[in-house]
Amino acid sequence: MRYLSLPILLFSSLFLTACGPAALIGAVGSAVTRTAYENDAKVNDYSQPAGPRNTLEVALANLKLGIGYMNEGLYEEALEKLNRAKEAEPDYPPTYNALGVLYQKLGVYDVAEANFKIAIKLNPADSSTLNNYGLLLCQSQRFEEADEIFMKAANNPLYATPEFAYSNAGTCALNNEQTELAENYFKEALRRNARIGPALIQMSELSYEQEKFMPARDYLSRYLDSNKHSAKSLWLGIRIERELGDKNAVSSYELLLRNQFSESEEAKLLSQAL
């Protein structure tokens, strides 16, 4: 299983140009409702059509709401808000970036690509959009095109988080069975940011597959320093510690996998392996 870091890319960098890195719009809780988002927007009432407003303010308010809805899986509401943002400011690149991600989530890849291309045409140096477009290309198995786009994003000297581009390029290379290239990309991602989770877990998996069990353990340990366990990380830990002969660690990982992810495919694999 390969680990793409799409959510990180969209929601951590979409607003860098317009609002600065502190303007992240993330999930506001597990039970967010349409009313809650609308009330939040009405602090400045910028998402409402009545009265003369600065069009960029209207676009930003609706864009933030659209991403909030997208985080919650409320795609119909997200599309409504993003279309309002586009109507208010038709040449604002981040709106098309968000629309691209939304249509990708909906599986409408041709419309997603069209929106990414508009965003890139409006702002060719936006590495966030390039990164998200690269993910779409990789998902569509257009690996060479994806690699070119990821490297364009990574080589932008103004891009604050090139490690995400390298990590995604590594994942895409793995999907294209280019293991050596993938490893080089993951190592470059970790050189830029030693704590980037997707690269750490992929390097742990690669090290395990290469029977380098001590490095595999080290990469997994570093991953867990800043990331919560998943079914995948626990199953990987079980396999690594079995090879290293640490029965206590194996038992601990197995217990966590059974208790926390009992319905996962990894838990089923564990049952089959016993």
Residue ranges and their predicted role:
Residues 71, 105-106, 139-140, 175-176, ...:
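Register position in tetratricopeptide repeats
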Residues 64, 97-101, 132, 166-168, ...:
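Canonical tetratricopeptide repeat
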Residues 58, 92, 126, 160-162, ...:
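Residue-level recognition of tetratricopeptide repeat
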Residues 54, 88, 122-123, 156-158, ...:
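Structural marker of alpha-solenoid helical repeat scaffolds
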Residues 95, 129, 136, 163-165, ...:
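TPR alpha-solenoid repeat register
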Residues 24-31, 37-50, 223-274:
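Terminal, low-structured helical/coil segments at or just beyond the last alpha-helical repeat
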